Amino acid sequence: MKMKKMLFATAAAALALLGPASAQDFPTRPVTMVIPFAAGGPQDTIGRIISQRMSELLGQQVVVENVGGAGGMTGSKRVADAKPDGYTMVLGSVGTHAQNQTLYKHPLYNVLTDFTPVAYLAITPI
């Protein structure tokens, strides 16, 4: 129950950040949320909850796309290569945005230059 409350509070805080964006004519088409892991895991669950509420608030469909592989680098790379117009986002994690950058000699993307943070959604305890 405590986790549900925390997730809801985090989601509400993240969605509150969408207020300034609503002043613009955005979105005019569906938004894609890439989850760089297989369906059914914790990132997928959080992403689907968030995307449903985002769809309601934005008045536009938010499509969840699971692109697993290479410890999350495959899906994250897809977003890094996408047009930076806000219509493609990644639900990153410590693995995709910190560990992979240090574990691999030549990571497929640079988290400091290829992504713009939007919201901090959840904490995964050890």
PLM features per residue range, with description:
Residues M1-T10:
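Bacterial N-terminal signal peptides that target proteins for export
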